[in-house]
Amino acid sequence: MTQDCDALILGGGLNGPALALALAQAGLRVALVDALPEAVRADEAFDGRAYALALASQRLLKALGVWQRVAGLAQPILGVKASDGRVGQGPAPFFLQFDDGEIEEGPMGFMLEDRHLRRAFFDAMAAEPNITQVSGETVIAQTPDASGITVRLASGRTLSARLLIGCDGRRSGTAERAGIKRTGWGYGQTALVCAIAHEQPHNGIAQQFFTPGGPLAILPLPDNRSAIVWSEADATAKTISALDDEA
């Protein structure tokens, strides 16, 4: 049986495209199925989400040809400061601090907004002849056979491959259809995510406060902006989310 591709990846977040590029650059024919339409995945509208990328992650993106597309949009992390604290009372007087002078390779990491990284992955895959992107489609069935596996999409289209890879998140339909069991639990916390602009420079320092309700991270972005990740107990986070701008 002739396969449509060597590897079929389900999931278009970050892991799926990264793996697709790595396999394609190794000479394999890859198809990636993404439930989101192209216009949504490639949209660069501001949504407040950002990633802290370790130096190893930045090197991986560079090797895949993705970093070159976003290097000018990333904020180097030049230091990390961590302390205990309480919201409204500020940090404790004792803290841990690390700076990039302690490593030889360069910055400790980089902050990069999700909207830019998503678009960079999308464009890099579009430029790779060994990758076929199938957007706005969901898988409803997967059937293994002697030569590989065949999946059926909601549109009725079928795709076959030697290998099926699930990169479709923690509630993976790929894993569920394969009968792979997962164990999980909740922490009773919700993360509130946003970005702010401020007058004083952050100097590339990432701040982390460990509060009774959960950690509060203030992470540097370009142009005197910072990404906020505030974890609180579910009930408290729900109350905060319901507040209006005046509050």
Residue ranges and their predicted role:
Residues 4, 73-177, 185-190, 245:
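Conserved N-terminal helical subregion
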Residues 5-32:
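N-terminal Rossmann-like FAD-binding beta1-loop-alpha1 element of flavoenzymes
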Residues 11, 34, 81-84, 196:
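Short beta-strand/turn micro-motifs composed of small residues
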Residues 15, 38, 171:
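Conserved Rossmann-like nucleotide-cofactor binding loop
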Residues 22, 120, 124, 195:
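Rossmann-fold NAD(P)-dependent oxidoreductase module
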Residues 24-49:
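Glycine-rich FAD pyrophosphate-binding loop
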Residues 45-87:
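N-terminal FAD cofactor-binding segment of flavoenzymes
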Residues 61, 150, 167-247:
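Conserved FAD-binding catalytic core of PHBH/FMO-like flavoproteins
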